[in-house]
Swiss-Prot record:
Homodimer. One of its GO terms (molecular function) is dihydroxy-acid dehydratase activity. It comes from Escherichia coli (strain 55989 / EAEC). Belongs to the IlvD/Edd family. This is Dihydroxy-acid dehydratase. Pfam families: ILV_EDD_C (PF24877), ILVD_EDD_N (PF00920). GO terms for biological process: isoleucine biosynthetic process; L-valine biosynthetic process.
Amino acid sequence: MPKYRSATTTHGRNMAGARALWRATGMTDADFGKPIIAVVNSFTQFVPGHVHLRDLGKLVAEQIEAAGGVAKEFNTIAVDDGIAMGHGGMLYSLPSRELIADSVEYMVNAHCADAMVCISNCDKITPGMLMASLRLNIPVIFVSGGPMEAGKTKLSDQIIKLDLVDAMIQGADPKVSDSQSDQVERSACPTCGSCSGMFTANSMNCLTEALGLSQPGNGSLLATHADRKQLFLNAGKRIVELTKRYYEQNDESALPRNIASKAAFENAMTLDIAMGGSTNTVLHLLAAAQEAEIDFTMSDIDKLSRKVPQLCKVAPSTQKYHMEDVHRAGGVIGILGELDRAGLLNRDVKNVLGLTLPQTLEQYDVMLTQDDAVKNMFRAGPAGIRTTQAFSQDCRWDSLDDDRANGCIRSLEHAYSKDGGLAVLYGNFAENGCIVKTAGVDDSILKFTGPAKVYESQDDAVEAILGGKVVAGDVVVIRYEGPKGGPGMQEMLYPTSFLKSMGLGKACALITDGRFSGGTSGLSIGHVSPEAASGGSIGLIEDGDLIAIDIPNRGIQLQVSDAELAARREAQDARGDKAWTPKNRERQVSFALRAYASLATSADKGAVRDKSKLGG
């Protein structure tokens, strides 16, 4: 029978000092035999996805206490990728994932907490907490802050839906008037919550459902809706049950590594491909799998991508649907239901509620359930009122979207495409693979060949695009922006958005060893591995080289002879200490970022730290 971890600090005469300090936090004699549960919050006023979380930790804590536990709350940092985008701040985004994971480990292990409730939401916070949860392997439940409502505005006598990406594109489009750009900017992000499309934050929150670590509805129920409060209340109660099951009944099925098994990771990736999730999810799932000591690699993702169709299409791949529409169609469980009926899921998995996949679908799939309360929950919709308050409205759609032929979520027979929304490509400068969000690629450019325009920083590429130096047919290559080379693996949302602003969204390709925002669409290929700074062949591409992209056949090829590439590699190696570094880039890199770069691996490994360099 496992012993409560917290007993280390609450039992025994030699722990008198620790108990004295616990008493100073409000604990009493009666508390010293109870499980101590960490409420891992991420409230900050910097990030709209987290601005409403201040009081939600208290909400969870009250339920933990009522159920017989002791709740202790702390916060992690949270970087807003949208605000950090387009300048040096983006260098810090991906490294913050590791800081978040480490900070959770530090706090939980330093104080010997028995379990956790993770209140996450945005891009690196959910992955960081997920990595920590699987590293620590103590009972955990995720409950996120929820998606933002889609923006809406009237243009040309028509009400259109908007999000952050629209504001960026129109702001850089010289054909758009100042007044229209201002109107879109003011309408794009109307409420608290994670940005309203299937961007990285919402993709990851959906994946925690598929992994079994959060409750049904977590990935899609709006931040502003009153129904979301119940997820927080339930999480506080349920975590105490899971904790007692493990420590008092020796039930290891309550542990995250036994819930988020390899089968669950395969289901999560299947969901991701089917819903056209952010390419960043590949990075984060690979990293989380390593923390769980699960053998889950790019090869597994490649195999899944070849058999899973696209059953859901959401912004940025279409402006017709946002997360509020996914929820109306049944949310994550609705997509999983269609995948299950197509025979594409592992059914022998359980979630934090203790339900198997078939049981979850029977109770929560809107196409199967007979529970009116569940149907009512999935009718939760937007209010269209600007607010930063959680649970501030109770609007509902008149009906569910259960049209699996023409609705937001489709059945296998009516799939958006036979190929899924993500694909892994391999070639002579991406030997370990690269990722493309096929959900956002127009059919006309699934095969594309063009001359390279090479840039050794995102900044130079943006200047060239806005300066008219990139023309239709070009393949923009941005290198030395990987985890080590950036350092920090910046997102390339500005270059891809500006290609659209310049009318080149369907006329150019962009390839990088960096990564893309979940808001990116178009022929945008990222995570090229190995990265240039690690001696990857992307560092050998020269202006004018022809690059052939073949998504249907999963290929990407630099049309240069092996002999020429060998000569270029020899010349690069001859640069000595300057080899595999940018030739003409001035960038201030802090000590913290240099420390991150010294251990960073390429994207095909999840951009995690190289344990071999630490003797691990």
